Amino acid sequence: MSGFVGILVSDPWLQNQFTQVELRSLKSHFTSMKRESGKLTVSDLASRMGKSKVVGDQNLSNEERATLIQNFHPNLNDEVDFEFYLRIYLNLQAHVNAIIGSGVKNSSAFLKAATTTLLHTISDSEKSSYVAHINNYLSGDEFLNKCLPINPSSNDLFEVAKDGVLLCKLINVAVPGTIDERAINTKSMLNPWERNENHTLCLNSAKAIGCTVVNIGTQDIIEGRRHLVLGVISQIIKIQLLADLNLKKTPQLVELVGDSKDVEELMSLPPEKILLRWMNFQLRKTEYKKTVTNFSSDVKDAEAYTNLLNVLAPEHKNPSHLAVKSSFERAKLVLEHADKMGCRRYLTAKDIVEGSPNLNLAFVAHIFQHRNGLSTQTKQISFLENLADDIQISREEKAFRFWINSFDGSVYINNVFEDLRDGWILLQTLDKVSPGIVNWKVSSKPPIKLPFKKVENCNQVVKLGKQLKFSLVNIAGNDIVQGNKKLILAYLWQLMRYNILQLLKNLRLHSNGKEITDADILEWANAKVRNNGCKTRMYSFRDKSLSDGVFFLELLSSVQPRSVNWSLVTNGVTDEEKKMNATYVISIARKLGCSIFLLPEDIIEVNQKMMLTLTASIMYWTLKQPLHLNKPIGSPDSHNGSLLDDSTSDSSIE
């Protein structure tokens, strides 16, 4: 939706090895690696590429990577430019491909933080599994009936996905209510603009539920780039399968821990780690002595599965299964056992013995959903009553987490309060928001064993916040190290707000260096709505009249007249009507191109922070339009001025 200048490489052959989204991602990684010391030499590459998780870190150690790089270019003191870096990247990828061949690890991203892998290969087994999943969960959809079921042995999936409807529907299966389906363009024949709107809605909504989509654009979906599309699908399905792996959805998980301190630790774990902990908890009830640490090599012999299912479904237990010597035969018996339990599964015995991490995780998640074997007694659950269940804190934590994860894929956190405590990711985020501000020479990289080094990092975080004029009267570095929730959220809000205001300042060429304020955003929004002939007004970002969502729909209609179907808008009187309008507002904003991380409840409750970010995101999208003309800041009419420069738009508020 925004302007985009492609990254050019002087060597045509090298240029043709990558898509523009890949070049953009690799350029971002390269710039980030170079930024630490101002230059990048061959000797630096191995460690910095490993830290940035650019190339197959699950397959190459730093030592292996360093050896390969040295073999390719022995002079370690030479400085690395971007094209040299691309050639190194291709060589390492070729080596990784040679190792994994057509086997287990040759698959789309699923367990990884990043949504899409840059390997241009996909696993047919995974594709078939995801198609089976889609056929199962979307079989009753009225619009998709004409193209379902999809043939898992063909590439029909990527054709069906091209109009964006299937991906939007799949997101709603994973996290119900994320997309207001009234906002999806579902005509039988979509024009390019309508199709692009669906893709934009899909990608912004995927970001909003926790997917990282930095390597994929709307054009990739249109072109049916299989490895990229499958990467998005796999993460959406993963989010669905792991949705119950938290104490809110499954309070019985408290049985896995001993006291309230352990409960807090459990709450901070990513869902796949909780799933592993649950699996080992059940296995301790058997004679199985090993600890399962992954969904690949540790389950390849199917022994862990045999014991797990014997515990969960003893009525189908057969002692002879453990005596089977062939892993493949044992895997087949495991799947028979799962079938008898009524547990739907989409993997084969071959997938188990080959250790497919994505499909094994999906299999265990299905088992957990079907029969978790946890106590329904309330005795252990009493621990939960002693924990503060602050819904607002949980909601803001999720918004800030997804915001941090949305930058460029080089940073990924699972829990704001745990993953930011050493200060390193906060420093990285500060450097993205205000490039060059961090003094990397006095910063310590993880793993950080000495506590005072964490405090030093966090002290710099606080110092830089004050430099950016944050209000940090009661915040010290040690508060971040200690995981003080309210103070961390207060810092992150100011960091997000600074990011938004700087983006707007960069786009408003007529600001003459003037800082943009909350009042400027408020006046811009009111002027837009007023000039569109509407009488509604927002008096502040706390204005309770915003709860019906109508003002934001009028704002969206003023910046893109065809965006709102007013026949779908309610009066916003009852709670249900307000929720319908709020959901519609969020979906229309994402459909235009706004990357926003809020829930309908934030609009209904008039969450001041989220009202500001929503308005600013709509303003930012409007100012980025290539033909949009603007007057100086504070002008009531923003339809005159000069063309905008969109070169600063590589950010998470889009």
From Swiss-Prot:
Record region (Actin-binding 1): 124-372
An example Gene Ontology molecular-function term: actin filament binding
Record region (Actin-binding 2): 394-623
Keyword Transmembrane: no
SMART domains in UniProt: CH
GO biological process, one term: actin filament bundle assembly
Cysteine pairs bridged by disulfides in the record: none
Primary location: cytoplasm
Subcellular location(s) per record: Cytoplasm, Cytoskeleton
Name of the protein in its database record: Fimbrin-2
